From Swiss-Prot:
Tissue-specificity statement: Expressed by the venom gland.
PANTHER family the record matches: ANTILEUKOPROTEINASE, WHEY ACDIC PROTEIN WAP
Disulfide bonding pattern of the chain: C34-C60, C43-C64, C47-C59, C53-C68
Swiss-Prot/TrEMBL keywords: Antibiotic, Antimicrobial, Disulfide bond, Secreted, Signal
Top-level taxonomic group: Eukaryota
Predominant place of localization: secreted
Signal peptide residue numbers: 1-24
Function text: Damages membranes of susceptible bacteria. Has no hemolytic activity. Not toxic to mice. Does not inhibit the proteinases elastase and cathepsin G.
Name of the protein in its database record: Supwaprin-a
Species this chain originates from: Austrelaps superbus (Lowland copperhead snake)
WAP domain mapped to chain residues: 27-72
Disulfide bond keyword on record: yes
GO molecular-function term, one example from the UniProt record: serine-type endopeptidase inhibitor activity
Length: 75
């Protein structure tokens, strides 16, 4: 069998191994529980704008949460 055929066969075997069983069985649940939510209320407004944050931090919005965070810089 050529190397291309072997790679194709290996690809199909990999896909087959990753498929969910068609018998309708779900994968077993992972052990443990989710930790409690952080103690912040669901909607917190720590800041109103960048200038209400200390130093170089920015006022970042995440849904209804406004909090001061260190900025990231993308090249």
């Amino acid at each position: 069998m050529s190397s291309g055929g072997l790679l194709l066969l290996l690809g199909f075997l990999t896909l087959w191994a990753e498929l969910t069983p068609v018998s309708g069985q779900d994968r077993p649940k992972k052990p443990g529980l989710c930790p409690p939510r952080p103690q912040k209320p669901p909607c917190v407004r720590e800041c109103k704008n960048d200038w209400s944050c200390p130093g170089e931090q920015k006022c970042c919005r995440y849904g209804c949460i406004f909090e001061c965070r260190d900025p990231i810089f993308v090249k």
